[in-house]
Amino acid sequence: MIKQRKIELLAPAKNLECGIEAVNHGADAVYIGAPKFGARAAAVNSLEDIAALVEHAHLYNARIYVTVNTILKEEELKETERMIWELYRIGVDALIVQDMGITRLNLPPIPLHGSTQMDNRTPEKVRFLADAGFRQVVLARELSLQEIRGIHEACPDVPLEVFVHGALCVSYSGQCYVSQACFGRSANRGECAQFLSLIHISEPT
């Protein structure tokens, strides 16, 4: 059964300026990288910038989601916890996360969304995340429309997010270790060297 919901247009923003423009041009929500532990390691945003974006977005009833979507080391968990509390205090609407270890931290009452980096491509995975307390699940970018429909029909009560624009790779998000193996730069730490994008050439059929 298909459950109809109002579609939320969620736009990416690498920084405060891009986020403000996305809101000004009609985005319902914007996602932006946290000061640390985001999948775009080079896109570092200060708490002050995120707070300014939250303030601007809320003037227009738009929402701000912050990505904390890398695999964390054990020694980083306390710092992550402190950062999440700071993000909560400045009014961030939700976090997009990859590492399930975050769910074991002492968290404020802030909604968690399951990142595409979690490799969310089956109904079973979506149900698992919903049962673990995730409010929304970002599906794998590599899914077909038929596969997305199947997941929605199997999990009609779970809000799903899907990418409609952006880069793709020959590997599933969150499951590729080529960059780490070849260059010592882990895609799951926000440092993908884009190696597979460089070598993959589609041949005409």
Language model regions located:
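Glycine-rich, proline-tolerant flexible connector loops at the mouths of alpha/beta enzymes
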Residues: 31-49, 68-75
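Conserved, mostly hydrophobic/aromatic
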Residues: 22, 99, 129, 162
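N-terminal basic/disordered segments at the start of proteins
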Residues: 2-29
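Conserved anion-binding
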Residues: 124, 147, 154-198
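Active-site-adjacent beta->alpha loops and helix N-cap segments on the catalytic face
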Residues: 41-51, 98-108, 142-155
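N-terminal active-site wall of soluble small-molecule enzyme domains
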Residues: 56, 62-128
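Residue-level detector of conserved catalytic or cofactor/ligand-binding positions
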Residues: 197-205
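Hydrophobic faces of well-ordered beta-strands that scaffold small-molecule active sites
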Residues: 9-12, 30-32, 64-68, 95-97, ...
